[in-house]
A protein has these predicted regions:
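Short, basic, low-complexity termini and linkers enriched in Ser/Thr/Gly/Pro
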Residues: 1, 131-148
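Non-catalytic, conserved peripheral segments adjacent to functional cores
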Residues: 5-119
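Compositionally biased, low-structure terminal segments
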Residues: 6-7, 128, 141
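Non-transmembrane, interaction-prone segments in cytosolic or luminal domains
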Residues: 14, 35, 125, 134, ...
């Protein structure tokens, strides 16, 4: 028997920012979930977004309690869509719409991501992103649609 994994895609109040909830299989041994599937993301998110996104780089960072990382953004032509998930600990992740001419310019969506919930947030290009660490030794996984240019 082949099990098909599912993720739930939830729209937020700002176009381009989505909450991603994976299906988690838990039992007495622990848990298992597919943290990302490009195929399933395309099937479920592309109709909402109106375009597909191919994530090409995967980053991980560890931060201590009280650290605030942000507001980070990229300028054209290096703007990135991001898919952010907290692996361990807790982080308040904030996405701010900095798209000129957008009806939600200057507005933000904040999501409390924890290593216990396994959910993530998809952030569109031309958004500023900030992460505020609210647990000791928090680990964040961050996928991006464009290779970082340092």
């Amino acid at each position: 028997m082949c099990i098909r994994f599912f993720m739930e895609i939830i729209k937020t109040s700002i176009d381009g920012v989505l909450i991603i909830e994976p299906r988690v299989f838990k039992d007495s041994r622990g848990y298992f979930f597919e943290s990302f599937s490009q195929r399933e993301f395309d099937e479920k998110a592309t109709p909402i977004l109106g375009h597909s996104i191919n994530f090409v780089q995967d980053n991980e960072s560890m931060s201590s309690y009280g650290v605030m990382r942000g507001l980070h953004y990229q300028r054209m032509p290096y703007t990135q869509s991001k898919l952010v998930r907290c692996v361990k600990g807790a982080v308040l992740d904030v996405a701010v719409d900095i798209r000129k001419g957008s009806p939600t310019f200057g507005q933000h969506v904040s999501c409390l991501l924890t290593g216990r919930d396994e959910e993530g947030v998809k952030i569109a290009e031309q958004f500023a992103k900030e992460s505020s660490i609210s647990n000791p030794q928090s680990i964040i996984n961050n996928q991006s649609s464009v290779i970082n240019h340092h």
